């Protein structure tokens, strides 16, 4: 309850940029529990998305299409903004053949609970039908030290998230670090180069390594 009250109070006056390296959905669940969805953005939007998943409940004989949110990098007008720099358990990469038989990624989608991420439909413009393309069989997130550093330059989502991170650091009035062990060299460099002359730095439960790196 304390964190929920804190977010609700601070968001009335300030923008809260939350950058996390975790893949779980804990923060999203917190936002839902605290009823803060109207003031929250994770960069994904359903508006204008041509992608659909299928929700099916065999027990109640229910089956219908569900529009999927895609990453648009739009955080405008929301006070609580979530940037998952390493991806998430509910992110998936949509790929399709364009001018060749080689599949090319064209969208990062967010899959709600209950939707089969292996069956993704895409609206065909001007037609009342959908295209079905081979789809990733695993969530879209980064893992492994070397892999993460290489993927940060990918233009589909990772590069944009990293640029957001740097820009937010440059604009920050206060930085709060919780539970970060300083194992990501790219993140460390971004903090050192872009934090600037922030007048107030707050550390909550930092490890010794975190304190030695940034204090």
Please place each PLM-identified region on the residue numbering.
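Extended, H/D-rich, highly charged conserved domains that either
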Residues: 9-143
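A Trp-anchored, charged/polar loop motif used as the substrate-binding/catalytic surface
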Residues: 1-2, 58-70, 150-164
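A generic structural signal for ordered alpha-helices
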Residues: 4-5, 63, 139, 143, ...
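A short acidic-Thr-Gly-centered motif at the start of a beta-strand
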Residues: 2-13, 72-75, 163-170
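A general marker of short, structured functional hotspots
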Residues: 2, 126, 136-137, 176, ...
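SIR2/sirtuin-family catalytic core signature
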Residues: 120, 145-215
